[in-house]
């Protein structure tokens, strides 16, 4: 009796030869938008997707590592925001695909593409966690507003709507909740009245 390894006994289908569309290419889709417009939108969507994935991971990290008097409230809030960021990721990735592009998906690609700095591996204080989240949201919001304006100018109303109605509004609401949690103090160290 000859024993074969599982990897030898199955017809493996993955590998470079089986890639049907390279990242960075734009497949033709008949939606009334030219390739250049779709390519520009895909780039902005993938950047927002990478930053949203990093923000999602920050929320889960802080959900697991939060401590202190507000543990319970923040533990739940961070998990709620995490879930809402996951919904945004799905919408962003599907829009990339609908425009004929390839969405970022692998963690190493996301870490490389994201403009949001990687956090330390260790546990941070609550003010540091919230400050880090606020900075990440601000990064997403600044870039999203630019991308929404460009999509609008290019006639890509679907991408503009996704940025404005979903990504910007969700991130602004998250910022509101985080800031209200720190109503007695400023997470960025600014003095009141300054």
Regions found by a protein language model. Give the residues of each.
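Short, contiguous alpha-helical
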Residues: 87, 161-193
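Acidic, low-complexity proline/glycine-rich segments
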Residues: 2-31
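Helix-loop segments that flank and shape redox-cofactor active sites
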Residues: 32-40, 55-80, 143-159
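A structural signal for well-ordered alpha-helices, especially hydrophobic packing surfaces
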Residues: 56, 63, 82, 89, ...
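Acidic/histidine-rich alpha-helical segments that form the ligand environment
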Residues: 62, 94, 108-166
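Long, contiguous binding/interaction regions
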Residues: 2-5, 9, 71, 103, ...
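Disorder-to-helix initiation segments
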Residues: 26-48, 126
């Amino acid at each position: 009796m000859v024993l074969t390894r599982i990897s030898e006994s199955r017809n493996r289908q993955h590998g470079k030869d089986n890639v049907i569309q390279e990242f960075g290419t734009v497949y033709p889709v008949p939606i009334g938008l030219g390739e250049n417009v779709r390519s520009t939108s895909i780039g902005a969507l993938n950047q927002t997707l990478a930053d949203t994935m990093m923000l999602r991971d920050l929320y889960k990290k802080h959900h697991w590592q939060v401590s202190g008097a507000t543990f319970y409230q923040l533990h739940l809030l961070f998990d709620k925001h995490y879930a809402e960021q996951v919904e945004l990721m799905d919408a962003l990735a599907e829009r990339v695909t609908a425009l004929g592009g390839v969405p970022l998906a692998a963690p190493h690609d996301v870490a490389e593409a994201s403009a949001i700095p990687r956090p330390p591996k260790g546990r941070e204080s609550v003010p540091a966690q919230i400050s880090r989240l606020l900075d990440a949201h601000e990064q997403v919001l600044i870039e999203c507003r630019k991308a929404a304006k460009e999509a609008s100018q290019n006639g890509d109303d679907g991408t503009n709507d996704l940025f404005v109605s979903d990504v910007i509004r969700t991130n602004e609401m998250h910022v509101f909740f985080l800031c209200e949690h720190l109503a007695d103090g400023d997470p960025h160290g600014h003095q009141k009245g300054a």
